[in-house]
Structures are given as structure tokens and as C-alpha cells.
């Protein structure tokens, strides 16, 4: 296994704001979609589509617009890595 950095990855820090709706580690316990187990590519594409308005939403467009494309990439990489780290 690759050696983990002692510092917390930026994507993990940025992902903390997602937990309020999507649950800890993206495991939602409500009608809000679970993002745990989704690929980084899927999450990044969805967030970029929310940001551009290509994907309709109630609140996700506003959330996604608050992040740079690089931050969206980091968030997606973090969530995409969770299911492989925990298996």
C-alpha cells in the first residue's frame, strides 16, 4: 500500500461540507443520494455539470459553484477512493 501522507488531503477537508447532506463518507441515510461507492470520474463529472448548470438541481449547483475545478477534482478523488480504501 502507498505510504499515507501525515497531512490530511485537501479533498478530505473539502469533503467535510458534503457530510451534512450526503452523510459521513458519503453514506446517506436519507433521500439524498449516497455518493460512497461512486467513481471519482462520476462524481467529478456530476459536480462540474451542477456547476455549469448542465445538470438540474435544487442546491447542488450553488454548492458546486463555490469550488474551483481543481477543488472539485480533489473532492471527487477523495470520495472515489473511499470504497477502495475500506474494502
From Swiss-Prot:
Its main location: periplasm. The keyword Signal does not apply. One of its GO terms (molecular function) is heme binding. The lineage of its organism: Bacteria, Pseudomonadati, Chlorobiota, Chlorobiia, Chlorobiales. PROSITE patterns: CYTC. Monoheme cytochrome that function as the electron transport subunit of sulfide dehydrogenase. SUPFAM superfamilies: Cytochrome c. Pfam families: Cytochrom_C. This is Cytochrome subunit of sulfide dehydrogenase. The keyword Transport applies. Heme c binds at residues 18, 21-22, 60.
